[in-house]
Amino acid sequence: NLCPKANIVKVVDGIATNQAAQEAASTLFQTNPDVKVVLCFNGEGCLGVNEYAMSSGNVEKSEFATFGADWSDQIAEEIHKSLTDESLYRGSVKFGSDNIPQNAYEIVTKMLTGQPYEKVQLDPIVTVDKTNIDKYYKAE
């Protein structure tokens, strides 16, 4: 009910690479040229859809978006570029802290040395989009 006018036109499983996502996007846009949003489970899927949409000439950039559930410096950069339609990767769900490897190391060290540690680790889940990308994007 959040998007009563939305129609799911295709579900594609198993997209794990940028190339596979570009191929799936090509097929999607050939069979459904009016697609306005693509949701992806992982970053590579979104990056591939974004690359296809940006280069195909078949997409009205101001009317299209892709969203995912993954995080990397490249994803942050693409979301930042979407502020000026230089990317169509409009947002992502960021899982975990800013330093997951360090946090994991600290927890494991405490476990191995018999020190007390939090038994339940709740990683933060944050939606990152144009409204808060400046907090997460670090220009090189």
Predicted regions span which residues?
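A residue-level marker of the well-folded mature domains of exported/periplasmic proteins
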Residues: N1-E140
